[in-house]
Swiss-Prot record:
The keyword Phosphoprotein appears for this protein: yes
Protein name, UniProt field: Neuromodulin
Disordered: annotated span: 1-238
Ranges of Polar residues composition bias in the record: 139-154
Subunit structure: Identified in a complex containing FGFR4, NCAM1, CDH2, PLCG1, FRS2, SRC, SHC1, GAP43 and CTTN. Interacts (via IQ domain) with calmodulin. Binds calmodulin with a greater affinity in the absence of Ca(2+) than in its presence.
Listed GO biological process terms: axon choice point recognition; axon regeneration; regulation of growth; tissue regeneration
Compartment(s): Cell membrane; Cell projection, Growth cone membrane; Synapse; Cell projection, Filopodium membrane
Gene Ontology, cellular component aspect: cytoplasm; dendrite; filopodium membrane; growth cone membrane; perikaryon; postsynaptic density
Modified residues (Phosphothreonine): T181
GO molecular function: calmodulin binding; lysophosphatidic acid binding; phosphatidylinositol phosphate binding; phosphatidylserine binding
PROSITE patterns per record: IQ, NEUROMODULIN_1, NEUROMODULIN_2
Highest taxon listed in the record's lineage: Eukaryota
Length: 238
């Protein structure tokens, strides 16, 4: 039996040796290789995880940066929109303010127009009245000048200075002139006292013209009488 066992053991050993020889690798070496493979795979797994984590972190950081960049333009757009709305609100407010001064400017202009119209309306009646007054005063002055210039009183006053013998005729001329001149003076006084109306001025002008026309024949007759008396006085002196 023992011999059989020895023989079998030898055979087994021989078989193992043959296998080792065939493989050329010992089991220890196989185990070491397997351990190294396991370690390498584990290390690779760890490195992969690290790389994935880094990639995830990088991706998250990139996403955060992208989100920030996206949010920044959005915030700028919102700010610009807010500024635009405030500017538009301020623009109508400022636009309404100039409108109010414009309205306020329109009211003084309207007031000025009303004052100008009232002034023109007042000046329009005053201008004809003043022109009528001037015309009436000019007519009265012309009438008084004509009456005073044509009155025989001045001539009667000059005649006594030149010729003394005519003193007898002078009082009659003076009395006649005194009788005529008060009428002209009364007419002139009435013309000045009466208001400057068209009817009053026309009537006064007609009265003055009639008074002047009445005085002119009398004065011409007196002048003719004075001329006739002058040769008689010259003959007496001669």
């Amino acid at each position: 039996m023992l011999c059989c066992m020895r023989r079998t053991k030898q055979v087994e050993k021989n078989d193992e040796d043959q296998k080792i020889e065939q493989d050329g690798i010992k089991p220890e070496d196989k185990a070491h290789k397997a351990a190294t493979k396991i370690q390498a795979s584990f290390r690779g797994h760890i490195t992969r995880k690290k790389l994935k984590g880094e990639k995830k972190d990088d991706a998250q950081a990139a996403e955060a940066e992208a989100n920030k960049k996206d949010e920044a333009p959005v915030a700028d757009g919102v700010e610009k929109k807010g500024e635009g709305t405030t500017a538009t609100e301020a623009a109508p407010a400022t636009g309404s303010k100039p409108d109010e001064p414009g309205k306020a400017g329109e009211t003084p202009s309207e007031e000025k127009k009303g004052e100008g119209d009232a002034a023109t309306e007042q000046a329009a009646p005053q201008a004809p009245a003043s022109s009528e007054e001037k015309a009436g005063s000019a007519e009265t002055e012309s009438a008084t000048k004509a009456s005073t210039d044509n009155s025989p009183s001045s001539k009667a006053e000059d005649a006594p200075a030149k010729e003394e013998p005519k003193q007898a005729d002078v009082p009659a001329a003076v009395t006649a002139a005194a009788a005529t001149t008060p009428a002209a003076e009364d007419a002139a006084a009435k013309a000045t006292a009466q208001p400057p109306t068209e009817t009053g001025e026309s009537s006064q002008a007609e009265e003055n013209i009639e008074a002047v026309d009445e005085t002119k024949p009398k004065e011409s007759a007196r002048q003719d009488e004075g001329k006739e008396e002058e040769p008689e006085a010259d003959q007496e002196h001669a």
